[in-house]
Design a protein with these regions (language model features):
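Hydrophobic membrane-insertion alpha-helices, especially the h-region
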Residues: 1-12
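N-proximal short alpha-helices
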Residues: 12, 73-74
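Aromatic-capped interface at the extracytoplasmic side
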Residues: 13-21
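A cross-family detector of function-defining hotspots
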Residues: 21, 29-73, 83, 92-139, ...
């Protein structure tokens, strides 16, 4: 009986856990699941993945796109160092982390990392998307968004 009640509470918690809609997230006007024109990108041939290729733009080597080999759709994006790249959710390298919270809300998980770095994670359970932001002293250092 006690196990049944505990299971009910766990299932209820998981279903009621907050999720954030990340389906329209963009970095440099690029969106997950959008097709890319491979001619406008540089393929990173140093890293070999089974189902994906990694690409960068000619003028932005610090913005990396993980692209499905089969359908050329963007499955993930990682941004570091480049302070000129904008997002549509308030996140920008060296920008304030509170700008992201203002745009996306407080339904995130947070972890402490080494050397005063922190990790903020937003989940979109409906669209299977994860947004991870590493920051230090409220200044964003790295932005990653991936879908399954």
């Amino acid at each position: 009986m006690l196990m049944g009640i505990a299971t009910l509470f766990i299932v209820s918690y998981i279903k009621n856990e907050h999720t954030t809609d990340l389906s329209r997230i963009t970095i440099d006007d690029m969106q997950l699941n959008a097709k890319i024109d491979k001619d406008k990108f540089i393929e990173d041939d140093e890293i070999l993945l089974k189902k994906h290729n990694l690409y960068t733009k000619h003028n932005q080597p610090n913005l990396v796109f993980k692209v499905n080999k089969g359908n050329s759709k963007i499955m993930g994006m990682t941004l570091i160092k480049n302070t000129d790249v904008n997002t549509n959710f308030g996140g920008k390298i060296e920008g304030n982390i509170q700008d992201v919270v203002h745009h996306l809300g407080s339904s995130y998980k947070q972890k402490k990392l080494r050397d005063a770095y922190r990790l903020m994670i937003y989940y979109d359970k409906d669209n299977h998307i994860k947004l991870s932001i590493i920051y230090k002293h409220d200044k964003i250092k790295k932005i990653e968004v991936y879908s399954k």
